[in-house]
C-alpha cells in the first residue's frame, strides 16, 4: 500500500515531461521488443515470454518514471511476485497497483499474495479470442 498520489500537477509533469523523454530515449528498444518478441509470444500463447518482455518494459520509458514515482517499494513487491513464479507481473497504467497474469489457480495466488502482505482486489479471466493476427502477402 502506498499513499503517493497518482493524480495532480506533479504526476502530470512526471508522465508528460520526464516520462516522454525516457520514452523517446527507449523507443527503439521498446519497438523492437514489441515487434520481434511480443508479437511472436502472443502468437505462440507463450505467457512466460510475454511476462519477461513486460518486465523489461517496466523499467523503460514512462513506466520507469512511474515506478520511480511510486518508490521502489512497488518494485520490491513486483520482484517478489516474479520470484514466486508468476509468469506476468507489471504495474497497472493507473498504478500504484500491480497486475499479474498467471496460469496458477486462485488458491495458489491467494496464498502467495497473502504471504507478501498483499491482497487480490480485482480478478478477471483472459479473453483468449481477443487478439487475431492475420498474415497477408
List the predicted regions and their residue ranges.
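Glycine-rich, charge-dense phosphate/pyrophosphate-binding loop(s)
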Residues: 42-137
Amino acid at each position: 500500500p502506498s499513499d503517493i498520489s497518482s493524480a495532480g500537477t506533479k504526476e502530470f509533469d512526471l508522465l508528460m515531461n520526464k516520462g516522454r523523454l525516457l520514452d523517446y530515449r527507449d523507443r527503439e528498444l521498446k519497438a523492437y521488443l514489441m515487434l520481434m518478441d511480443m508479437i511472436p509470444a502472443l502468437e505462440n500463447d507463450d505467457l512466460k515470454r510475454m511476462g519477461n518482455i513486460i518486465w523489461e518494459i517496466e523499467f523503460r520509458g514512462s513506466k520507469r518514471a512511474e515506478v520511480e514515482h511510486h518508490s521502489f517499494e512497488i518494485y520490491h513487491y513486483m520482484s517478489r511476485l516474479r520470484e514466486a513464479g508468476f509468469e506476468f507481473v507489471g504495474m497497472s497504467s493507473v498504478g500504484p497497483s500491480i497486475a499479474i497474469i498467471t496460469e496458477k489457480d486462485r488458491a495458489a495466488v491467494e496464498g502467495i499474495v497473502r504471504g507478501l502482505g498483499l491482497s487480490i482486489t480485482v480478478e478477471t479471466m483472459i479473453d483468449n479470442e481477443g487478439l487475431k493476427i492475420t498474415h497477408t502477402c
